[in-house]
A protein has these predicted regions:
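Bacterial N-terminal signal peptides
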Residues: 8-20
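N-terminal prosegments of processed precursors
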Residues: 26-116
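Extended acidic/polar, glycine-enriched regions
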Residues: 109-176
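Fold-level signature of zinc-dependent metallopeptidase catalytic domains
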Residues: 154-215, 225-235
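Short pre-active-site segment immediately N-terminal to the catalytic Zn-binding motif
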Residues: 196, 293-316
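Active-site-proximal segments of metallohydrolase catalytic domains
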Residues: 220-296
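Catalytic Zn2+-binding segment of zinc metalloproteases
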Residues: 317-333
């Protein structure tokens, strides 16, 4: 009993210390958190940016001031915060965007759209230039937009309204500055369902830390949970005529994909999240239907009540947290390929232009053929039939239990097929990845990023560990 009381006291103390709701709590060591909200608009041919507002969030900067520069080389974009007077880069982080994905869809060829975006950084003492960079066709970053931010300017919003909800400490391992802070948000939960949300958040967080390398690095994480109640249970699924006004605006059918779940209401997301310490966000949608999504450096989503919620939570977090590529290629997606096979920036996919320079070559045993043979023809044949059946069942709006049974049977078939393959557990270069049947290669035959299996391949594990180190590792000198 005394141990239980002591744990409760320590959690409460850590919570009070970590989320003191006042900018005054910031110090020289931990400055305030500054946020630049902006509009990112355009189409398949071009893009534009425009400032919406600059504000100071209620909580101090959650990250380490000793690890402010990103050397991971991840993301389609990168933000740099530069001291105007000296030209010194004070802060940088790679990220990707919903606009970046949308711009490769058919709609972007005929329509111009705007998306809300934000970048957060430690509040500087002097005026800074915020630069947004984008990868070019060579994979190198170049500046596409910049704007000057004066932290002392009169139009900086310095006072936020009182928090409508408070974060729940799920896992507190230490001070936020020394840890990765993951915030689990709920969307589509009524006031009566808040207990269910907390229980699900705890269950899924616990599951995340059973999967390597999160299991071995669990002490490097803090996890918080928070949800604003809604009047109706669930989020929108337009393809079935279901529309709900959920607080975060999360919905299915993004880009016309029935399983793709995102929110495009960035302001609603950030205005709620700012009341908890966070660097990463996963949104649990209060729905049974299979679905999720993940954008590197933005957020990820998962259907909380689906039979595959554990898998969805981890798979989508892999996208958001580490910028891992999807390794599957048989499921339909809205993105349009331009036919080119440029080297992906993601750590777990390659165009294999030069096998001698394979980016995960250190994982490959001597004598492993590159490309690496696997039963691709048999896999593809089954996948075509499976995708037809899946599409037919979705068109008929069959019960989710039937869909889950289909997914389970598909995974069992894959496991049985792969069990006979000589390179079953090898690290190599297996053709078929990044939504393409040919021209892109994945590190191992099977991985959480390829199908609904339970483990990350060794290359993905390394990619995840790199990001953990960026936020919670020993600072480089």
């Amino acid at each position: 009993m005394q141990q239980t009381l002591m744990r409760s006291f320590l959690c409460a103390l850590a919570l009070a210390t970590a989320i003191t709701p006042a900018v005054q709590a910031a110090s020289h060591a931990q400055p305030a958190t500054m946020r630049l909200d902006y509009q990112h608009s355009g189409n398949a041919l071009g893009e534009h940016y425009a400032v919406e507002r600059v504000l100071v969030e209620p909580l101090p900067w959650p990250g380490s001031m000793a690890r402010t520069l990103d050397d991971s080389n991840r993301g389609v974009n990168m933000v740099e915060v530069v001291d105007i007077k000296s030209g010194k880069v004070l802060y940088s982080r790679g990220f990707s965007t919903i606009f970046g994905e949308w711009s490769s869809t058919d709609e972007a060829k005929t329509t111009t759209r705007a998306f809300q975006e934000s970048v957060r950084f430690p509040q500087p003492e002097q005026p800074v230039r915020v630069r947004i960079l984008k990868r070019d066709e060579r994979g190198l970053f170049s500046i596409v937009w910049s704007t000057d931010v004066d932290p002392k300017a009169q139009d900086v919003i310095r006072q936020q309204p009182p928090a409508s909800v408070k974060p729940i400490p799920i896992r507190v391992s230490g001070a936020s500055a020394d840890k990765v802070d993951l915030l689990i948000l709920g969307d589509g939960y009524t006031a009566a369902e808040m207990g269910s949300f907390e229980a699900t958040a705890r269950k899924l967080a616990d599951h995340l830390f059973t999967v390597s390398p999160f299991r071995e690095r669990a002490d490097d994480f803090n996890v918080w949970a928070m949800a604003a109640p809604t009047q109706e249970s669930g989020v929108s699924r337009p393809s079935t005529g279901v529309h709900h006004a959920s607080p975060l605006g999360t919905r299915y059918d993004i880009f016309g994909s029935e399983r793709y779940v995102l929110t495009t209401d960035n302001r609603a997301l950030r205005d709620l999240a700012q009341y908890a310490p966070y660097e990463f966000i996963e949104i649990l949608v209060n729905n049974d239907t299979y679905g999720g999504g993940g954008i590197f450096g933005q957020f990820s989503t998962a259907a909380a009540n689906n039979d595959w919620a554990n898998y969805l939570f981890v798979h989508e977090f892999g996208h958001h947290f580490a910028g891992l590529a999807d390794e599957y290629y048989t499921s339909p997606v809205a993105y349009q390929s331009n036919g080119e096979r440029q080297e992906p920036w993601e750590p777990n996919a390659t165009a294999l232009r030069d096998p001698a320079k394979l980016k995960w070559k250190s994982h490959v045993k001597a004598g492993t053929p590159l490309p690496t043979p696997w039963p691709k023809e048999a896999y593809d044949s089954h996948a075509r039939e499976y995708q037809k059946e899946r599409a037919a069942r979705r068109a008929q709006n069959r019960p989710e239990s039937e869909m889950s049974a289909l997914f389970k049977a598909d995974l069992a078939h894959t496991e049985q097929l792969f069990s006979k393959a000589p390179q079953r557990h090898a690290v190599g270069a297996f053709e078929g990845a990044n939504y393409e049947s040919t021209g892109f290669y994945r590190p191992e035959m099977q991985c959480i990023m390829f199908d609904r299996s339970e483990t990350f391949c060794s290359v993905c594990q390394d990619g995840i560990s790199t990001i953990i180190d960026l936020y919670a590792g020993t600072p480089k000198r």
